[in-house]
């Protein structure tokens, strides 16, 4: 996240830290942002706060991003993490008597995700480019929150534990990552090179046990 924030050209950066441990927030500011908070808004709700606080921290960050977008700015929004936002809504939903429908998550969780995520995007004056992190157990991409997020967003970048163990950083699994808009935002040559690279990586993956 810090690399993206420092390297982006967005005028305004909005960072939502939902469900993080309290000590991780100053560490993130110091080590990842190098204490540089210029044109940056940070919204936090730590793991020891109530589910309502964690839930509305995400919506507050999105509202702040929308405010600057409607003022004509290009905004970068980063939210860590959607999983903890969903867990907060799960606590709220189950406490009000909602039945769990998928791995303990009630229907309200899956109704809220598009209400949050689909607010990002362009307006007549500005734009919001949003990155939402999703945590999955054991790199299981069939996790219901990951699955629902993929169906809403324009693309996903998959980071895997096995690439981390091999020393790759950032550990991006190119074969599992995807973009619905890549052919619209890069040159034709770039896109063709990407397809060639993906075919090569696919062959390596198929034959890695040999």
Label the model's feature ranges.
Residues 1-210:
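P-loop NTPase catalytic core
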